[in-house]
Regions:
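PAPS-dependent sulfotransferase catalytic domain
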Residues: 9, 195, 200-202, 209-351, ...
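A conserved segment at the C-terminal end of the G1
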Residues: 123-136
């Protein structure tokens, strides 16, 4: 009997020891990576694209006995960026050293702005650029505007002011932005390098002074916006304080509308649910692209989502060349991981890319497709998307929706 008691006592003691070791390793300063925060965790990328459905992960509370000071975070981040980019090829950017691209050193970062609309592949493209070390990712700064397209004043004035301020790392006076983020955490969580410090102190994400200082540490900035049309960005391109390039991402309206069917946020909004408004914006963007490509050579790029999905590696390197960025190992790993596996979730960026762009052919009813094509005929012709003639033609393997296109002024 005594031996049995001793045996059970030893088992219990051993079990408690294992639990303590595991707990200690999980919360050690240099290893703590909660599953919903890890930048490389699969679930990180199963996010609501634009946050119209609440992101389920709250900002984590501090699990440490003490909170790192702002100065410690700034210094640690500065050192980390230097280490991660110690072998980076800056020659593509025209810079000789890292400091030339840092605002805190008086330099100009390389800045990119992705312009598109809902469900057009911006989440994937944004994550591609965010995979490059030293990138500060401004995710959807206009979330607070709701499910609307901003096509002109007065909303465009406020929207462009917000975009300019963020690209200049000046978050002063942006109380609306921070207040929205207090209840919509995805506004911050996509910016993985900022979010990584919110787990220590959630107030950091709402601190304009910290966010401004933190932003100025980074040599690369990328921003994605799905609520502003291309013709409005001329004001940004004219701003001499910015080192900005603009990338317009277009997608087949049939694929866009098929993808939007899965989003409950979309249906109440005419801007999101009416294909005629989507295609009117596509025509507007086509006209603006012709004008801006002529006026700002080498600063505007046009890309169809299907090209990125069908050949992500080659297309990504075209984008990098346009942005004057160099490929990195982390970017190559991201592309390999995110384009060769399928993970469930309508906002997942883990997809077998070649299967995504033409999914609409097999899941949409032809009558609905025909309705889209009727109101989108001109937009589809301009952007090089072929028409489906009937249900049999639409579903056939021989029907390739992509055609050539040319942008003219």
């Amino acid at each position: 009997m005594l031996r049995r008691v001793n045996f059970y006592s030893i088992c219990i003691a051993f079990g408690l020891s294992v639990l303590l070791i595991l707990a200690g390793s999980r919360y050690a300063d240099n290893t703590y990576r909660p599953s919903m925060e890890s930048g490389r965790n699969v679930r990180t990328f199963l996010k609501v694209e634009d946050g119209e459905e609440n992101f389920v992960a709250p900002i984590p509370s501090n699990s440490y006995d003490s909170v790192p000071s702002v100065e410690k975070i700034i210094e640690k981040t500065r050192s980390k960026i230097k280490f991660e980019l110690s072998k980076y090829n800056f020659s593509d950017s025209g810079a000789h050293e890292l400091e030339e691209l840092l605002m805190e050193s008086g330099g100009q970062p390389i800045q990119s702005l992705i312009i598109s609309t809902w469900r057009s592949g911006t989440t994937f493209l944004g994550e591609v650029l965010n995979a490059i070390p030293g990138t500060f990712y401004h995710y959807e700064p206009l979330l607070k505007h709701g499910i609307v397209q901003i096509r002109g004043p007065p909303e465009s004035t406020k929207a462009l002011r917000t975009i300019k301020s963020m690209l200049k790392c000046n978050f002063v006076g942006m109380s609306d932005y921070f207040e929205y983020g207090m209840t919509h955490f995805h506004q911050f969580s996509h910016n993985t390098r900022l979010w990584d410090h919110c787990k220590f102190n959630k107030e950091l994400c709402y601190d304009y002074d910290f966010t401004s200082r933190f932003c100025k540490l980074f040599p690369f900035q990328t921003m994605k916006v799905v609520r502003v049309r291309l013709r409005l960005v001329q004001d940004l391109l004219d701003d001499k304080e910015l080192n900005l390039k603009v990338l317009l991402l277009i997608r087949d309206p049939r694929g866009v509308m098929q993808s939007r069917q899965h989003r409950t946020f979309c249906q109440p909004s005419a801007d999101c649910w009416q294909s005629e408004l989507l295609c009117a914006d596509m025509i507007s963007d086509y006209v603006a692209a012709g004008r801006l490509l002529s006026a700002y050579p080498n600063r505007v790029m046009v890309l169809r989502y299907e090209e990125l999905a069908l050949d992500p590696n080659a297309t990504t390197h075209r984008i990098l060349k346009f942005l004057r960025l160099s490929a990195t190992q982390s970017l190559d790993e991201f592309l390999k991981l995110h384009t060769n596996v399928e993970v469930a979730g309508v906002s997942s960026t883990f997809r077998v890319s070649r299967d995504v762009p033409f999914k609409w052919k097999n899941v949409l009813d032809f009558n609905y497709v025909d309705e889209i094509q009727t109101v989108c005929k001109d937009a589809m012709s301009l952007w090089g998307y072929r028409m489906a003639h009937n249900a049999t033609h639409m579903k056939s393997a021989e029907f390739i929706p992509l055609d050539n296109y040319t942008i003219t002024e």
